[in-house]
Amino acid sequence: MAQVDSQDRWGEASPLSSLTEEAHDTQMLSMNLESDDEDGGEAEKEGTADPVACPRGSSPVTHENPDLPWPHPLGKEEEKFSDSSSAGGMGQKPVEMSGKASWSRDVTKINETQGSPGASRALGSLPSGLAHKLLGQMQPLGDRLPAGDDGYSGANQDAVLDVPPSFPSNGKYLCAHKSVDTSAGNSSLLCFPRPGSNWDLPTQETHTPAQASATPASLAAAVLAKARNSRKVQNQAGRREGGEAEARPYRCLRGGRAFQKPSKPLSPAETRGGAAKRYACELCGKAYSHRGTLQQHRRLHTGERPYQCSFCDKAYTWSSDHRKHIRTHTGEKPYPCPDCGKAFVRSSDLRKHQRNMHSNNKPFPCSECGLTFNKPLSLLRHQRTHLGAKPFRCPACDREFAVASRMVEHQRVHSGERPFPCPTCGKCFTKSSNLSEHQTLHTGQRPFKCADCGVAFAQPSRLVRHQRIHTGERPFPCTQCGQAFARSSTLKRHQQIHSGEKGFLCAECGRAFRIASELAQHIRMHNGERPYQCEDCGQAFTRSNHLQRHRAKHGTCKKEPIPSSSDE
């Protein structure tokens, strides 16, 4: 509300000034009321009338009090209007109190005044608009206002109830003096509501000296600002509480923080270094202690691979995997085995090598044959040989496998893929184990020796199979005829005799073979490949057994074990 000078408020914008023009019409009303009760009027002028018996029940009001906070611009005609309106409309009587006069409502007097014949005749001679206003002023202060000309009858429930009635006008009320105390600095005003206004009536208050020193505009501005701020704070608090309750309905019982999704309580295992895992994934609910770790975890859901290899087209999610992959191009192997000196690209590969090759700790024995293994997965694979379970089927030839990796290696036979090349001679292999065995031909390194005969082998699996010759162990029996074999590959060949299965077809001539090694040897006849060459004369052969027979002809040739691609 803008600050307005008190003189301007009483001059142009005051609602009392709009009624000044109608004050001449109200003289007839006051004369009629005085003629109906002439005796009461004379007693009132002489000051001897009983205050209780006075039909108007009001003392004369003086507008020339110098203690008022603003000058009154109205003349004697307004005084007449004030006397008549207060006498006919208020129906109140003064009560003797110490120092000042107080007022009490008398609804019976108001009803009697409204129903008097003189008042009815006087109101009937007035215009309808003015009579409507006077009747609105004669209602008790506690009643709700009637509907205005615009038909709006609902009272504004958000009206400011603590607006002091001491300032003259705010566009909704008409103010008139109630009484003037004999003591200096004490005065009070009565606010008459305008008919048709949608404001609730304010409570009557006594005008204090502190209020008298302030201007009406400043008082109204302060009150409205206070109410506006209080409603604003309440609305913001309600929206904040309601929005938070709707968006974050789950609250921690210990810390008081609110969350969008429920989660189980944190256990000691879910904290690292005493720090709670506060950053939870929105998709799977997994929590982390640091925001950066959560951002890296989100790549698993989005499929983002920001680490691109500069040598090939492969990309990786984690920087550690990217560094390990780079070592395959550079040939770096920073993890050597302390027992045999073999180096590895990954530390996990070194641990696996030490566990499989150099460790004698094999706590997982097979209940069927007693063979021990160093990890439960190896035991599970071995037990499938006894049970005959082969859950992995090749989609090309319907061949079944007990291990998924064996099926992947088998599918390379159909596709012709050989992803493991020899860095020395360039020969490619379908299995990494076959490449390792082939590389021993170039290096001559055979670190695994038999304790019985002293024969050395490049792979520990070769040593294990060789030791079965001395022990006579045959751990792979046939489920149909009961015949046992020392090697699993030999058992597979034998089982194909019973089934008659030949799942390996030659793409050139259509000939079928039972095992992949036979198909590989057959394909060499079509492409002319001769990978087995005699070191003495340089003659090459398609099969390793042909090379062995050729060496037998040379007296100086030594018979060396040739690795077979079909053996495990």
Curated annotation (Swiss-Prot):
Could you tell me the Gene Ontology terms of the biological process aspect for this record?
regulation of DNA-templated transcription
Q: Which InterPro entries match?
A: Znf_C2H2_sf, Znf_C2H2_type
Q: Where in the cell is it found?
A: Nucleus
- Would you tell me the Gene Ontology cellular component terms? nucleus
Task: Please list the residue ranges that the record marks as compositionally biased, kind Basic and acidic residues.
Answer: 1-11
**Region named Disordered:** 1-106, 548-568
Q: Give the record's keywords alphabetically.
A: DNA-binding, Metal-binding, Nucleus, Repeat, Transcription, Transcription regulation, Zinc, Zinc-finger
List the SUPFAM superfamilies: beta-beta-alpha zinc fingers
User: Which is one GO molecular function term here?
Assistant: RNA polymerase II cis-regulatory region sequence-specific DNA binding
Per the annotation, which location comes first and is thus the protein's main one? nucleus
Output the superkingdom of the source species. Eukaryota
Q: Which SMART domains match?
A: ZnF_C2H2
Mark the C2H2-type zinc finger spans by residue number: 279-301, 307-329, 335-358, 364-386, 392-414, 420-442, 448-470, 476-498, 504-526, 532-554
Belongs to which family?
Belongs to the krueppel C2H2-type zinc-finger protein family.
- Give the function comment from the record: May be involved in transcriptional regulation.
Record protein name field: Zinc finger protein 648
Q: Which organism is it from?
A: Homo sapiens (Human)
Gene that encodes it: ZNF648
